[in-house]
Each structure stands twice: as structure tokens, then as C-alpha cells.
Swiss-Prot record:
An individual GO BP term: [2Fe-2S] cluster assembly
InterPro entries on file: Aminotrans_V_dom, Cys_deSase_IscS, Cysteine_dSase, PyrdxlP-dep_Trfase, PyrdxlP-dep_Trfase_major, PyrdxlP-dep_Trfase_small
Protein name listed in UniProt: Cysteine desulfurase IscS 2
Classification of source organism: Archaea, Methanobacteriati, Methanobacteriota, Archaeoglobi, Archaeoglobales
Residues that hold [2Fe-2S] cluster according to the record: C321
Gene field: iscS2
Metal-binding in keyword set: yes
Principal location listed in the UniProt entry: cytoplasm
Family annotation (HAMAP family): Cys_desulf_IscS (MF_00331)
SUPFAM superfamilies documented for this protein: PLP-dependent transferases
Organism listed in the record: Archaeoglobus fulgidus (strain ATCC 49558 / DSM 4304 / JCM 9628 / NBRC 100126 / VC-16)
Catalysed reaction, written as an equation: (sulfur carrier)-H + L-cysteine = (sulfur carrier)-SH + L-alanine
Length: 382
């Protein structure tokens, strides 16, 4: 098997699993309890919090643990907007954001907020001048990904931060970028930053929102007031410990790993683009080291994915969170592609356990798959 769907799901690193196990069977206390078991659990959560903050140079803020990146994005968008509505109700969101940002923004529109979507160019880069032009006295929030999870394009977040100059809060969804490129909240000027555990080989079902001390949010989940009152519900201690360990490993190893993945990525791109009428989606240079997003004329991405799976190669057509809808990717549509072009897309994402042999297998199988599918397409003519 050759797995090229690391953006959808990653395995838990064995070192992470080892760190988690004692908190499932031995140190199983509730962090809110006042006895020794609770103290040990509380101490473990705090240690993990510090490790996650350190990964993004987040000493100037706090980490709030959530059930994942989706909840963290909801907390950032809805929580910040609701808390700061008296300052204004104008929000800017990029057109290529994950649906866990776009749908909360749509929810806010129904609550009386005005949301404008920042357009992107053909490579998926946001138009910074649009942000500059649209900034108003009542603009309270701008939300932009650090890098796109589908096409891999890295956004000019530092430039955006300079344009904002503190006039509005900046939320950055760094789900796709942490562990792939440098993520430093001070350098990029983030007021809030979303991080996913599984995207750095930690357990699923846990994520975090880093929040600068000056940023004030309203909780979106109410209950016992855990996580400094911003996220109620007993903390998932084993998963949080695993998240912390994954952050610790990532901080030490990401640069070397990114360079290895970049080499594999470039090898795939160079060879796949030799196939007739194949095109790279996303920026040719400013892209994540693990991302290959290509489209093929005259065939559908779903057919390519199924054919590759039959050959023992796993890939995808886009975001796993919305790929079941069979709708064309809103990211690719925002980049100006036609419906049929967006439907012909194959997404290959590399990860920690990919090898040169995996790439060999992919490059051996893929050209034949494309040729076979095109031979059955009524649109294809040699």
C-alpha cells in the first residue's frame, strides 16, 4: 500500500501513543478534581498546553484545547464576533477558507453581521489590496488560512498583518501549515491561531485555538467553565497529552521532515506533469512541501481515486471534510476553474511515512490509470 492522503488523516506517531497510554489506565483523574489524581491530570494538561504554545512561539497568549480544528475555528469566528459586536459587525474572510470558517461566517451573517469574502488569484493567493480597500472602522475580524489544505498555496499572512496594523483582529487557520513550514504567531501577527493535533501526528478529536492575551472571546460551548471559561467540558487528558507530545516532536523534527517531503513532492510534480493535458493547481513555488494537487482533462477525480485504490494507492480529490458531496471544490472554483476542470482534480499529500518506493509505485501506476480512463471518456479525442 502507498498512502498519499495525509491531509485527510495521519497515523498517530508511536512516541505519541506511548505518552498517552498511562493517562488512559493509570493517571486517569479529572483535571477539575482537587485530589492527587486530579492534580496529576491538571499538571499534564498544563504541560501539554505549554508545548503547543511553544511550537508556534505563543508565549504571549494562551492555548485553549478543543475537540479539533473545526471547533477551534468556530470559537475563533463566532466567539470573537459575538464578544466584540459592540465594536463593529464587519468581517473579512478569504474565499478559499475551510468550511469550518466559511459556515460560521455564514451563521454570523444571519445574526446581523456583514461578511465580505476576500477574492484570490489563479494560484489561490488572497488579494491583500482588497483587504486594504475594504477595511472600515467597524471591521473587527479578518480570517485567512496560513496555507490552503487543498492546493497547498501559502498565504501572505505577514503582509496582511501589516495592512491590518491592529485595526482588526487577525485569525489564522494554521491546520495545514503547522509541521510543514515555520509557524510563529509573532512573525505573522496572529491574534488567534488554529492548530490540529492529528495534522502533526497526534490523536484525532483534539485541537487548539491559540489566543493572544489582548483578544477577548465569548465561549460557544457552555457548561462547567473549563479552559479558562472558553471551552466547557471535562478535558480529554490522554489526547491532550498526546497533542503535547506531538507538538514537542514536531518542534524538533519539522525542518528535516519538510525538506524530505519537498524532494518527494517535486519528483511527483515533475513526472506527473509529463502526462498529456495535466496541470498543477496552486502556486508553483509558494506551496506546502507535502502538497501535490493536479488536474487532468477529460476525466473525473473520483474515478482516478477509485482506480488508484484498486492498485493499492490511496489519494483524494480534495478536502476530506466535504468530498462526499461530489460538489466541485469551492477552493478551485474561487481560483477561476470551470466545473469540469475542478472535477478532474487529484490531491496527493505526503507524510512522515512515505518513501521513495511509494513514489515509484505511484509514478508506475498513475499514467496507465489516466490513459485507461480517458479511453472510456466521450470527451477525449487523441
Amino acid at each position: 500500500m502507498a498512502y498519499f492522503d495525509y491531509t485527510s488523516a495521519k497515523p498517530v506517531d508511536e512516541r505519541v501513543l506511548e505518552a498517552m497510554l498511562p493517562y488512559m489506565t493509570e493517571s486517569f483523574g479529572n483535571p477539575s478534581s482537587v485530589h492527587s489524581y486530579g492534580f496529576k491530570a491538571r499538571e499534564a494538561v498544563q504541560e501539554a498546553r505549554e508545548k503547543v504554545a511553544k511550537l508556534v512561539n505563543g508565549g504571549g497568549g494562551t492555548v485553549v484545547f478543543t475537540s479539533g480544528a473545526t471547533e477551534a475555528n468556530n470559537l475563533a469566528i463566532i466567539g470573537y464576533a459575538m464578544r466584540n459586536a459592540r465594536k463593529g459587525k464587519h468581517i473579512l474572510v478569504s474565499a478559499v477558507e475551510h468550511m469550518s470558517v466559511i459556515n460560521p461566517a455564514k451563521f454570523l451573517q444571519k445574526q446581523g453581521f456583514e461578511v465580505e469574502y476576500i477574492p484570490v488569484g489563479k494560484y489561490g493567493e488572497v488579494d491583500v489590496s482588497f483587504i486594504d480597500q475594504k477595511l472600515r472602522d467597524d471591521t473587527i475580524l479578518v480570517s485567512v488560512q496560513h496555507a490552503n489544505n487543498e492546493i497547498g498555496t501559502i498565504q501572505p499572512v505577514e503582509e496582511i498583518s501589516e495592512v491590518l496594523a491592529g485595526k482588526a483582529a487577525l485569525h489564522i487557520d494554521a491546520t495545514a501549515s503547522v509541521g510543514q513550514i515555520e509557524v510563529d504567531v509573532e512573525k505573522i501577527g496572529a491574534d488567534m491561531l488554529t492548530i490540529s493535533s492529528n495534522d502533526i501526528y497526534g490523536p484525532k478529536g483534539v485541537g487548539a485555538l491559540w489566543i493572544r492575551k489582548e483578544a477577548k472571546l465569548q465561549p460557544v460551548i457552555l457548561g462547567g467553565g473549563q479552559e479558562n471559561g472558553l471551552r466547557s467540558g471535562s478535558e480529554n487528558v490522554p489526547s491532550i497529552v498526546g497533542f503535547g507530545k506531538a507538538a514537542e516532536i514536531t518542534a524538533m523534527e519539522w525542518r528535516e521532515e519538510a525538506e524530505r517531503l519537498r524532494r518527494l513532492r517535486d519528483r511527483i510534480i515533475d513526472n506527473v506533469l509529463k502526462i498529456e493535458e495535466s496541470y498543477l493547481n496552486g502556486h508553483p513555488e509558494k506551496r506546502l512541501p507535502n502538497n501535490v494537487n493536479v488536474r487532468f482533462s477529460y476525466i473525473e477525480g473520483e474515478s482516478i481515486v477509485l482506480s488508484l485504490d484498486m492498485a493499492g494507492i490511496q489519494a483524494s480529490t480534495g478536502s476530506a471534510c466535504s468530498s462526499k458531496t461530489l460538489q466541485p471544490s469551492h477552493v478551485l472554483m474561487a481560483c477561476g476553474l470551470k466545473h469540469e476542470e475542478a472535477h478532474g482534480t487529484l490531491l496527493l499529500t505526503l507524510g512522515r511515512y512515505n518513501t521513495d518506493e511509494d513514489v515509484d509505485r505511484l509514478l508506475e501506476v498513475l499514467p496507465g490509470v489516466i490513459e485507461r480512463l480517458r479511453s472510456m471518456s466521450p470527451l477525449y479525442r487523441r
